[in-house]
Amino acid sequence: MNRLILCEGKTDAILLGYYLMKTDGWALEKKPPSGLDIKAQERNENVVWYKKGNEKLMICAVGGIDNFGQFFSRYIQRPILNASNGDPFPRIALVTERDDRDIVEIERDVTEQLSPFFVGTKNREWITNNYLDSFGMEKQIETLLIIIPVEHQGALENVMLDAISEDPYDKNIVDKCTAFVAAIRPEANRYIATDRLQL
């Protein structure tokens, strides 16, 4: 079975892939399954395959929060609709960062981007979507939206810093680094102008 994770950016894709390799036994795979040789075409996109036993996983950086729909329609939709021997991706996970937005707003935005192929998305809940393939057969695809972090606004980097900070020794290092970056930010504004870069 093939699995698919769509995420916002290259850093997210790299971190997710690394995490899955270290915690769940996935390994980099150079050869994609037949008919799924999907290549990123834009500078801010990325496509990497992983393998674990007979399962394959493709993690794609779509190039930003507003590009889920465009990336899906350009690269993913055609192989799904034209599949003659099963479903290439029966389950798709969408990983996005909360940043400074509300969860309901993100669910609505992602659903609008992927409409009409997906009828809805809900944070941390599998949703079944029905569609007709190019042969007129009714099929189903399940989607899971994962908004990171759930507890507060922020990005994947916030989750990593929170996890590192669970150890008192490492928390001290994180706190000192955060204070250092905050102190130099006025002078280094040209290099760390956004809150995201300050993380």
Labelled PLM ranges:
Residues 1-86, 93:
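RecA-like P-loop NTPase motor core
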Residues 87-198:
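Activity-critical C-terminal alpha-helical subdomain
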